[in-house]
Amino acid sequence: MRPLTIIGPTGTGKSDLAIEIADRLSGKIAVEIVNADAYQLYRGMDIGTGKVPLAQRRGIPHHQLDVLDVTETATVAGYQRSAAADIEAIASRGALPLLVGGSMLYVQSLLDDWAFPAKDPAIRARWERRLAQVGPARLHAELVRRDPAAAAVIPLNDARRTVRALEVVEITGRPYAASAPRIGSPRWDSAIIGLDCETKVLDERLAARTKAMFDRGLIEEVISLLPCGLARGVTASRALGYAQVMEALKAGADTQALDSARQQTCLATRRYVRRQRSWFRRDRRVRWLDATVSTAAHRTAIIEAVLGAWRRAS
């Protein structure tokens, strides 16, 4: 069965919509949800990632949730292999694979069946030594000189992606982006729906979302994960909210530090949303729906529009 994909910025209600769609199809078509959020892969990282609690999943099978320990490194290539296998297995059972998430590379690696550039451990080790010597900012400046286009989309503090880009540029002799496939027909002919809303409204939702995360126990969740190795995790330690809380804990965890962590989490999430919008909006295959209004009638209209687009594609 042809998959349905729901993408869009953080805070637009993608996960809730997926469950509502599965409910709407209940008794007609079985639906299984496949996560495409990098940090929801991690066990124990629930509150800060916006993971739908088990009790609220309404018995709908979910895949690619809670599959990694916080000390394990999440990779796009590893996710692509596992999620593609899930999607094909779901379809083979006659069920609808519903891919949901906002991690840009994870979504595109699946929909465009990326082939990943080769790796060279010796070259990577050399760049990692360089990183240890000069730090993330100066290494990123090196990427600016070698591949300005890659540097423009890789955040200054994302040392892991900076190292990978420099490795690929050295191996291939071409810009990092040249290794990415062109956007064509989506894999499995998936219907792709994008959710977004007015910036002012989304900013308000992100502020409320951040407050709710802290009120529900994000700080306690981070503290509980520290003995599990959260601070050592290459990927998990960079998650929005978790990184900011760990900094506050290092600073003494007083009221001022924790308030700052909440403010910085909200600001970082807004910056991330801008990157998500920039990335997803360039994909002309996406049918965008406005999730600004949250009334029951408008929600019903969105569900009908999503199902209509999927049925037409099928």
Curated annotation (Swiss-Prot):
Q: Would you say which domain of life the source belongs to? A: Bacteria
Q: Which example biological process does GO assign this protein?
A: tRNA modification
What's the protein here called? tRNA dimethylallyltransferase 1
Source species: Mycobacterium marinum (strain ATCC BAA-535 / M)
Cofactor or coenzyme needed? Mg(2+)
Q: Which GO terms describe its molecular function?
A: ATP binding; tRNA dimethylallyltransferase activity
Q: What class of enzyme is it?
A: transferase
Q: Which of this chain's residues are annotated to bind substrate?
A: T10, G11, T12, G13, K14, S15
Q: Would the keyword Transferase turn up in this protein's UniProt record?
A: yes
UniProt xrefs under InterPro entries: Dimethylallyltransferase, IPT, P-loop_NTPase
Q: List its EC numbers.
A: 2.5.1.75
Under the heading Pfam families, the entry gives: IPPT (PF01715)
Which PANTHER family did the record assign?
TRNA DIMETHYLALLYLTRANSFERASE (PTHR11088:SF60)
Residues at site: Interaction with substrate tRNA? S103, R124
Reaction equation(s) it catalyzes: adenosine(37) in tRNA + dimethylallyl diphosphate = N(6)-dimethylallyladenosine(37) in tRNA + diphosphate
Q: Does the keyword Nucleotide-binding apply?
A: yes
Q: Which Gene3D superfamilies match?
A: 1.10.20.140, P-loop containing nucleotide triphosphate hydrolases
Q: How does it assemble?
A: Monomer.
The record's comment on protein family reads: Belongs to the IPP transferase family.
Its biological purpose is as follows: Catalyzes the transfer of a dimethylallyl group onto the adenine at position 37 in tRNAs that read codons beginning with uridine, leading to the formation of N6-(dimethylallyl)adenosine (i(6)A).
Protein residues bound to ATP: G8, P9, T10, G11, T12, G13, K14, S15
* Entry keyword set: ATP-binding, Magnesium, Nucleotide-binding, Transferase, tRNA processing
